[in-house]
């Protein structure tokens, strides 16, 4: 029974739960690695000593947080749980493929961990650029294992994307138009399209790298007429849509949370929100070379990528101001989920502003590969994606489990985390502006002060993570059951109660026009 339920599951709720648990577990591993990084950088001089090991830790931290924490939780966990409930579908379109998507991830994770434990590990950075990732600078099987890991994670995501697109287009009730689906459903569908279009390009790039390393091809080797810059184009054609894949489901969740705790029945500017997400998805594919301003692109190429990148700020701004307009005049409830959403809006906006700075190719020449870039993408990931995940988690926790979190502790957890991440990443802007480069395990004494502050911040975040584990335990131990949910008419995922029965919407739902 246990094996049938959890290993061979075809139920979207169970698979969503598996994704959430797997993502939480991977998140702990990724957090541990990030604390190793900050411990090394907490003072001048060496702690680990070996730069190769340091870079293996940095690389693994990135891969784990992206492919095994944010994506499984946002798309696999929240997506699986909520999308069928929100559109009134009995399950996903392909329930067994759904199960396969999940079970490809643990082997993928295992391969990634294996890549660090054999030979010297893959100390390439998450971008895996040749020639550093070639078979000379990285002899041994480490990089090959990392490539296979990416292949499995990529197949998992592509299958999941097919499943979500089919489900959302095909499994709505007959009367429901695409423009009546909730914004979270839209965000997952757009994310799925991005995955479907970008991951095959990554697969091509890393497969060419694999043959370069093992079969003596020269796709990325000038000695045989290849070009390492080709790899960068292939990687970033995936890599840039990927960062929007990481944040778009978060946008959807934030829209729901802000609407709910403002006491509104709908978000401000629904169609504008949909348009903005579609625009972001489209533009995300035509800006990839802004990651390559320092590789010698033509001046008019740089001009195009600078301006195209800045255009993305427009739909993003539409979303931010629509969230603020949703808040406006609302009956605001200061719940923990609302705090996460407000923190998201504020900090994501700051991350967006530093993104506008980096979009300028002339400025980026100076800031590329400094801690300014690290600060920028951690503001949008560590405080955008993660805050959205936390907000979604505390908002939908009663739906998933039937129990309620302790309100006061959940708020305390938010404030500890808020202080921790800001203390960790705000000083990194200063380090970057004064020229501290990324991916080095040591630095000149001049950079000591802000690195100390940053490392202290990381340990404050650690206490927040530990407190979160306790808060979840406390909720299960106290068993405070959900009495009633407000606004269920406009939030149909709550209609079946908390937690909903194993099978929901077995008869089609009828929607009043």
Swiss-Prot record:
Residues bound to O2: 244
GO cellular component, one term: mitochondrial inner membrane
Binding-site residues, Fe(II)-heme a: 61, 378
Endoplasmic reticulum found in the keyword field: no
Gene3D superfamilies xrefs: Cytochrome c oxidase-like, subunit I domain
Compartments it resides in: Mitochondrion inner membrane
Assigned EC number: 7.1.1.9
Keywords: Calcium, Copper, Electron transport, Heme, Iron, Magnesium, Membrane, Metal-binding, Mitochondrion, Mitochondrion inner membrane, Respiratory chain, Sodium, Translocase, Transmembrane, Transmembrane helix, Transport
Pathway annotation from the record: Energy metabolism; oxidative phosphorylation
Free-text comment on the cofactor: Binds 2 heme A groups non-covalently per subunit.
Mitochondrial matrix topological intervals: 1-11, 87-94, 171-182, 262-269, 328-335, 401-406, 479-513
The keyword Mitochondrion appears for this protein: yes
Enzyme class: translocase
Residues holding Na(+): 40, 45, 441
Cofactors: heme; Cu cation
Binding site for heme a3: 376
Residues exposed to the Mitochondrial intermembrane side: 41-50, 118-140, 213-227, 287-298, 358-370, 434-446
Covalent crosslink: 1'-histidyl-3'-tyrosine (His-Tyr): 240-244
Binding site for Cu cation: 240, 290-291
Binding locations of Mg(2+): 368-369
Quaternary structure, from the entry: Component of the cytochrome c oxidase (complex IV, CIV), a multisubunit enzyme composed of 14 subunits. The complex is composed of a catalytic core of 3 subunits MT-CO1, MT-CO2 and MT-CO3, encoded in the mitochondrial DNA, and 11 supernumerary subunits COX4I, COX5A, COX5B, COX6A, COX6B, COX6C, COX7A, COX7B, COX7C, COX8 and NDUFA4, which are encoded in the nuclear genome.
Function: Component of the cytochrome c oxidase, the last enzyme in the mitochondrial electron transport chain which drives oxidative phosphorylation. The respiratory chain contains 3 multisubunit complexes succinate dehydrogenase (complex II, CII), ubiquinol-cytochrome c oxidoreductase (cytochrome b-c1 complex, complex III, CIII) and cytochrome c oxidase (complex IV, CIV), that cooperate to transfer electrons derived from NADH and succinate to molecular oxygen, creating an electrochemical gradient over the inner membrane that drives transmembrane transport and the ATP synthase.
Official protein name in the record: Cytochrome c oxidase subunit 1
Organism ancestry: Eukaryota, Metazoa, Chordata, Craniata, Vertebrata
Gene: MT-CO1
């Amino acid at each position: 029974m246990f094996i049938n339920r959890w290993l061979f599951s075809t139920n979207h709720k169970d698979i969503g739960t598996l994704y959430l648990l797997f993502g939480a577990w991977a998140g702990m591993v990724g957090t541990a690695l990030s604390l190793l990084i900050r411990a090394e950088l907490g003072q001048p001089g060496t702690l680990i000593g070996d730069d190769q090991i340091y870079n293996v830790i940095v690389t693994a931290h990135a891969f784990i947080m992206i492919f095994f924490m944010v994506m499984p939780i946002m798309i696999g966990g929240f997506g699986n749980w909520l999308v069928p409930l929100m559109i009134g579908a009995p399950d996903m379109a392909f329930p067994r493929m759904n199960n396969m998507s999940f079970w490809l991830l643990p082997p993928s994770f295992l391969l990634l961990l294996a890549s660090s434990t054999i030979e010297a590990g893959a100390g390439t950075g998450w971008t895996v650029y040749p020639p550093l990732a070639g078979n000379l600078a990285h002899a041994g099987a480490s990089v090959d294992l990392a490539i296979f890991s990416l292949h499995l994670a990529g197949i998992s995501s592509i299958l999941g994307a097919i499943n979500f697109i089919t489900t959302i287009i095909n499994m709505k009730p007959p009367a429901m138009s695409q423009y009546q689906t909730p914004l979270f459903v839209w965000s997952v569908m757009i994310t799925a399209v991005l995955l479907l279009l970008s991951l095959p390009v990554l697969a091509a790039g890393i497969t060419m790298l694999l043959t370069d390393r093992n079969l003596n091809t020269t796709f990325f080797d000038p000695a045989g007429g290849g070009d390492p810059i080709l790899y960068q184009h292939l990687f970033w054609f995936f890599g840039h849509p990927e960062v929007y894949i990481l944040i778009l489901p978060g946008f959807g969740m934030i829209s729901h949370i802000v609407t709910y705790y403002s006491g509104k029945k709908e978000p401000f500017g629904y169609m504008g929100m949909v348009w903005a997400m579609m625009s972001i998805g489209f533009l995300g594919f035509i800006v990839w070379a802004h990651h390559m301003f320092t590789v010698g692109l033509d001046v008019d190429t740089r001009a195009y990528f600078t301006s195209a990148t800045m255009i993305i700020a427009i739909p993003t701004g539409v979303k931010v101001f629509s969230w603020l307009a949703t808040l406006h005049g609302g009956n605001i409830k200061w719940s923990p989920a609302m705090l996460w959403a407000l923190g998201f809006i504020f900090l994501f906006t700051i991350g967006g502003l530093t993104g506008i700075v980096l979009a300028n190719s002339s400025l980026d020449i100076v800031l590329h590969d400094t801690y300014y870039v690290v600060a920028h993408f951690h503001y949008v990931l560590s405080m955008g994606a993660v805050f959205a995940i936390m907000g979604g988690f505390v908002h939908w926790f009663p739906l998933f489990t039937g129990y309620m979190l302790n309100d006061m502790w959940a708020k305390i957890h938010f404030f500890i985390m808020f202080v921790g991440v800001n203390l960790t990443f705000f000083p990194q802007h200063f380090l970057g502006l004064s020229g501290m480069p990324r991916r080095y395990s040591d630095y000149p004494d001049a950079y000591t002060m802000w690195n100390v502050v940053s490392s202290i911040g990381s340990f404050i975040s650690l206490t927040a993570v530990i407190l979160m584990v306790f808060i979840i335990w406390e909720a299960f131990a106290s068993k405070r059951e959900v009495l009633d949910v407000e606004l269920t008419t406009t939030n149909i995922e709550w209609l079946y109660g908390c937690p909903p029965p194993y099978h929901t919407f077995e008869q089609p739902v009828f929607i009043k026009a």
